[in-house]
Amino acid sequence: MKVGILLVTHSDIGKQLLLTATSIFGKNPFRVELLSVDNYDQPNDVKELAEKYVKFLDSGAGVLVLTDIIGTTPSNIASSINHDKIKVVAGLNLSMILNVFNYPENSLNQLSIKALEGGIQGVSKI
């Protein structure tokens, strides 16, 4: 059993990050679903869809939900998903996804830590 991944982002941010990460990594080692939130979407409708995706993705190991900006509609929806085995990490960036991709056999808790580590490592003043 592998952890499922749900990307909940503004517009196509998640789609583009996933495409780029898959291209760099060479493959996508997880079962992933994308949920794009646009300004015309109704939050309750999106939350209902997010919960359906989580149920679909959870093979027993749980679901890691990655979202872009904390405190915005996508992250608020992600943090309100009602499911027992879920971890939500905000601040999505390419480094975060790539770091998660490196650990497909890790547990949900371990992957949430890897997501945080990857996200932080991808931010630097140069």
Predicted regions and their residues:
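N-terminal loops that bind phosphate or other acidic moieties
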Residues: 2-64, 69-126
